[in-house]
């Protein structure tokens, strides 16, 4: 069983010391989603929401969230991120409900991974879409948020299998 690395000998929280770790390229990809009704789907697709361009605003929120992860997740190291990207794709197969899939990719060259930054970006992106469209319908559903893949670092690569 793996030990918790964020607990010191007295049982208190600590931030892990990464001083001796090797600098490597690290990338993480995360996923989230939000399911909306037809009215919101059309507003987002046609850019007619009264608050502005929902997807552009959500993309910026996701990028800002990744950059600020260490300020909201207590044991995360502040990292010099080298790339952040947010992609959207619609799933229209369950109309009149529409699911907007969110994929975030975060990269760095450093001593610790960017999984939390990618997950935070995906979450904040979904939350921003909810915030910008909640006046139309508060019944939206933010879906599962999970790590799709990660590369680099001592623990090696990870790729989520479809049955995970």
From Swiss-Prot:
The record's section on InterPro entries has: MoaC, MoaC_bact/euk, MoaC_sf, MoCo_biosynth_MoaA/MoaC, Mopterin_CF_biosynth-C_dom
Q: Name one GO biological process term.
A: Mo-molybdopterin cofactor biosynthetic process
Listed A to Z, the keywords are: Lyase, Molybdenum cofactor biosynthesis
| Active site residues according to the UniProt entry | 131
Q: Which residues form a coiled coil?
A: none
Source domain of life: Bacteria
Q: Which reaction does it catalyse?
A: (8S)-3',8-cyclo-7,8-dihydroguanosine 5'-triphosphate = cyclic pyranopterin phosphate + diphosphate
Residues binding substrate, per UniProt? 75-77, 116-117
The EC number(s) attached to this protein equal 4.6.1.17
Looking at the Swiss-Prot or TrEMBL record, what is one Pfam family this protein matches? MoaC
What enzyme category does the UniProt record give? lyase
Among PANTHER family, the record links this protein to: MOLYBDOPTERIN COFACTOR SYNTHESIS PROTEIN A (PTHR22960)
Q: Give the similarity note.
A: Belongs to the MoaC family.
Q: What's the protein called, per UniProt?
A: Cyclic pyranopterin monophosphate synthase
